[in-house]
């Protein structure tokens, strides 16, 4: 069995976790108490959903997940919510005081008190697995727990489970909608720390999701629930191939093999279509060609950046629902002829395609329309460097005046860590720039030196 353990860190991670597990349960027909009427092999069995759920002898399905937050309020909502019976109480771990939006508190002072307990619970989950394939880590870049504790945990996971892959779903601080002044500090520190520990990181930009909710779903003032349900759909599309049998099954390592050309360049851009409200869906066809085209619209991306200014290195299309390979091939052929899409010249225009016959499920009373087919595109493009550039610029403005730095130093961090992290991100931007340069030009430049 190829199991995955999900780790939800901090408020953002936990709330996205709620949305995801709610959706997984609906998709697999698992009731809030963990019973699954359709499951005939009680107490075990090798069903494909067992990658995400373990089964007890009583036929209860328990998510292979851990929820961690340094303060209790958000996890308490899970403890008292609809799905309270789904999780084992030990899977919900909380501390007493929060990280107060401070990376240093999450990573050093408060985080280190709880990290051994968390690793202990993760070890228990790992022992239930026959062939653990890796971890999915959900967190935000901006919060203290999401940045500091998540990076600490990933460092420790690398030590304990060296060869297992670690995929991140990270909430990137939105350019306009900010929840904390020190988000740029936290984001850059956490990116620097986790860069070598993460195998693949799907970034989600709150503002991009806000815009999609406003524009496509006609929600005037989207709440976090709206955002998280949309993010849940995306996570579900990415993990559907792990949980259902499809025509082309993608496992965790396969993502990296196809999307990550160099270890540091592991930030694919996710795009999901169709995002459409029930009123509109009634009047639209949403053919395979249409939803495939929609993926190349910057408006449907999860991070604000413009791929038309960058080049693609790899592209992964994950279809689900009523889709046949013939339609997909036709749609992709059309895209290739349009040529608005530039691939780097060292990578032939490779599209990897996965098809999963399980149609997308929607949460009852949610905003998304029930559709027959959907697609999630994961593309590694040099344009995502724009997101890093934006963040670095904000950090420079604040750090030039050393604003707020004393809060970090006071929690036992050294000021040198800031400049180290900043240099690492400058190098990351440079890496992206170099990857996008045509190889012919690059060789010509080298020739001139000798």
From Swiss-Prot:
Its EC number is 3.6.5.-. It catalyses: GTP + H2O = GDP + phosphate + H(+). The modification 3'-nitrotyrosine is found at residues 83, 450. SUPFAM superfamilies: Tubulin C-terminal domain-like, Tubulin nucleotide-binding domain-like. The keyword Acetylation applies. Its cofactor is Mg(2+). Keywords: Acetylation, Cytoplasm, Cytoskeleton, GTP-binding, Hydrolase, Magnesium, Metal-binding, Methylation, Microtubule, Nitration, Nucleotide-binding, Phosphoprotein. Some glutamate residues at the C-terminus are polyglycylated, resulting in polyglycine chains on the gamma-carboxyl group. Glycylation is mainly limited to tubulin incorporated into axonemes (cilia and flagella) whereas glutamylation is prevalent in neuronal cells, centrioles, axonemes, and the mitotic spindle. Both modifications can coexist on the same protein on adjacent residues, and lowering polyglycylation levels increases polyglutamylation, and reciprocally. Cilia and flagella glycylation is required for their stability and maintenance. Flagella glycylation controls sperm motility. Some glutamate residues at the C-terminus are polyglutamylated, resulting in polyglutamate chains on the gamma-carboxyl group. Polyglutamylation plays a key role in microtubule severing by spastin (SPAST). SPAST preferentially recognizes and acts on microtubules decorated with short polyglutamate tails: severing activity by SPAST increases as the number of glutamates per tubulin rises from one to eight, but decreases beyond this glutamylation threshold. Glutamylation is also involved in cilia motility. The modification Phosphotyrosine is found at residue 432. GTP binds at residues 11, 71, 140, 144-145, 179, 206, 228. One of its GO terms (cellular component) is cytoplasm. It is an enzyme of class 3 (hydrolase). The modification N6-acetyllysine is found at residue 40. Dimer of alpha and beta chains. A typical microtubule is a hollow water-filled tube with an outer diameter of 25 nm and an inner diameter of 15 nM. Alpha-beta heterodimers associate head-to-tail to form protofilaments running lengthwise along the microtubule wall with the beta-tubulin subunit facing the microtubule plus end conferring a structural polarity. Microtubules usually have 13 protofilaments but different protofilament numbers can be found in some organisms and specialized cells. The MREC motif may be critical for tubulin autoregulation. Belongs to the tubulin family. This is Tubulin alpha-3 chain. It comes from Bos taurus. The lineage of its organism: Eukaryota, Metazoa, Chordata, Craniata, Vertebrata. The gene is TUBA3.
